[in-house]
């Protein structure tokens, strides 16, 4: 076997390990590659101890609440801006505490729906990403097997140059391996996103409840 092939094949075990915990260890969901525990979706009550959400009315029917909810739910809005935005919104109700509390509850309902919807999409995307990585890992293993088979080929011992088809296979193997590793590194960050969104939702819920 030539030196290039040996080097690549010697790193195959490391490649498999890079596939992520879900590919190396049994999981409840084989398509979940993250070390973080999978929570498929969230519920409003996880973060809210304020007034009844249903009794406050449909947040989408309250234009002011909907605009604010979408603004503060967006990750483009820094959390340091949320408090002042809530203060401005609350000031519109003067001394009418009941109206203010219901409006703020609608704001929370909107924030929850926006962030949870974004989070659901991320979780679904991670599953599809994991499936793609698994398929690529299988393809790379197949390529490695084909390269290793040349070791026993009749012409392998005396050959001074790689046959064209073998050279192309090793080039493809190296390229696929590089792509796989880069995607594995990206997955580490992507896996953090659902938890970051949960944290943002929890912090905004706390800020809203502090204004009640």
List the predicted regions and their residue ranges.
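N-terminal Sec/ER secretory leader and immediately downstream segment
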Residues: 24-101
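Alpha-helical oligomerization segments
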Residues: 156-212
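Bacterial N-terminal signal peptides
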Residues: 10-20
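Long amphipathic alpha-helices with heptad-repeat character
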Residues: 79, 126-129, 133-143, 147, ...
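Short, charge-rich amphipathic alpha-helices with coiled-coil/heptad character
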Residues: 94-126
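Extended, amphipathic alpha-helical coiled-coil scaffold segments used for oligomerization/tethering
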Residues: 102-109, 113, 134-177, 181
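Surface-exposed polar/charged interaction patches
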Residues: 75, 92-96, 114-117, 132, ...
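Bacterial N-terminal signal peptides that target proteins for export
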Residues: 1-11
């Amino acid at each position: 076997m030539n030196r290039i092939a040996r080097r690549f094949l010697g790193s195959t075990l490391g490649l498999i390990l890079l596939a992520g915990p879900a590919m190396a260890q049994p999981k409840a969901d084989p398509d979940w590659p993250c070390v973080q525990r999978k929570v498929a979706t969230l519920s409003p009550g996880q973060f809210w101890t304020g007034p009844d959400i249903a009794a406050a009315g449909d947040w989408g029917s309250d234009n002011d609440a909907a605009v604010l909810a979408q603004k503060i739910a967006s990750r483009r809005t820094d959390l340091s801006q949320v408090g002042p935005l809530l203060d401005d919104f609350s000031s519109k109700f003067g001394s009418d505490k009941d109206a203010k509390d219901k409006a703020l509850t609608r704001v929370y309902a909107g924030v929850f729906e926006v962030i949870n919807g974004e989070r659901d999409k991320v979780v679904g995307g991670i599953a599809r990403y994991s499936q793609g990585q698994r398929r690529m890992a299988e393809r790379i293993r197949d390529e490695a097997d084909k390269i290793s088979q040349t070791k026993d080929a009749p012409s392998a011992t005396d050959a001074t140059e790689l046959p064209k088809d073998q050279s192309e296979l090793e080039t493809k193997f190296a390229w696929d391996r590089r792509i796989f590793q880069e995607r594995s590194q990206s997955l580490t960050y992507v896996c953090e996103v659902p938890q970051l969104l949960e944290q943002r939702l929890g912090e905004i819920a706390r800020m809203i409840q502090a204004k009640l």
